[in-house]
Regions:
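Juxtamembrane intracellular "pre-TM" segments in multi-pass secondary transporters
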Residues: 8-21, 200-228
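Conserved MFS/SLC helix-loop-helix module at the cytosolic interface between two early adjacent transmembrane helices
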Residues: 74-106
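Cytoplasmic helix-loop-helix junction between adjacent transmembrane helices
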Residues: 120-155
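C-terminal membrane-cytosol helix-exit motif in multi-pass small-molecule transporters
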Residues: 186-205
């Protein structure tokens, strides 16, 4: 098939690369990094504090650490619906502030049951954070660079996963557990302030529709995504083992 002169000229022009590192995208990455640092600096020291200071049994320790993830799983479907139907930025900033305030629960908790309740409440909030944050990032990233943008956005959480435990253990050894809880609170408040500066694009208001229970279930559980979800779940078991190594090393004093 012959091509016209205009088509040949248009094909010869290189495509314009849409900028990725915009002001709003960098703010979203910084806010995500703050959240990662605040969360992961507490991960390695919480078992040490519970077993060392409160003499919590291994059974209670397992429940306290795992209830966080279970609560996040429970809250994510509800937050996913709210994010799709509401103001994503408002939800993100509000949940971010709630996450910051939830760290104060560690400062006042004095029993295993209080830590369990704090972890459950914070897990519910964490489910909203990990749902609204990436969703708003998708709105900011240009569609032509979505894969690259989500890759760098996810790397900020990975960076927090790397630096957070190092910072947390150093602060715990020098200043104690309560300084970490307040530093996590401050990091989250700073992250919420950064998130509030993001100029999220306006989305059309969706009209409410009547949904049958089957449609609701199909929307919440994407059947084609189940195999990928199983793969992620299997890979997450390794993280559970890694998060326990620092406690095991502390118990054996390095004689593994």
């Amino acid at each position: 098939m012959n091509r016209t002169r205009d088509e040949l000229a248009a094909a010869a022009i290189p495509p314009v690369k849409v900028p990725l590192w915009t002001r709003d995208y960098m703010l979203a990455c910084c806010a995500n990094l703050m959240m990662g640092l605040a969360f992961f600096e507490l991960v390695p020291v919480l078992p040490l504090y519970l077993t060392g200071q409160l003499q919590v049994s291994s059974g209670w320790l397992g429940w306290i650490m795992s209830i966080y993830v279970l609560a996040a799983i429970l809250s994510r479907p509800w937050f996913a619906h709210r994010v799709d139907s509401g103001d994503r930025k408002k939800i993100y900033v509000t949940v971010y502030i709630l996450l910051a305030l939830s760290f104060s629960g560690y400062a006042v908790a004095a029993t295993a049951l209080m830590f369990f309740a704090t972890r459950f409440i914070q897990g519910l909030i964490w489910g909203g954070m990990t749902t609204s944050g990436p969703t708003m990032a998708v709105d900011i990233i240009p569609p032509s660079r979505r894969g690259e943008g989500l890759g760098f956005f996810g790397m900020t959480m990975t960076l927090g996963m790397c630096l957070g435990p190092v910072i947390g253990l150093q602060v715990y050894q020098q200043y104690g557990f309560y300084v970490i809880t307040w530093s996590s609170l401050v990091l989250c408040l700073a992250g919420a302030g950064i998130a509030s500066l993001i100029r999220a694009p306006k989305r059309p208001v969706q009209e409410p529709v009547q949904e049958t229970p089957k449609k609701v279930l199909d929307r919440l559980v994407l059947r084609v995504g189940i195999p990928l979800a199983v793969n992620v779940m299997i890979a997450s078991f390794s993280y559970g083992a890694v998060s326990y190594t620092h406690l095991r090393a502390h118990e054996t004093r390095g004689n593994l």
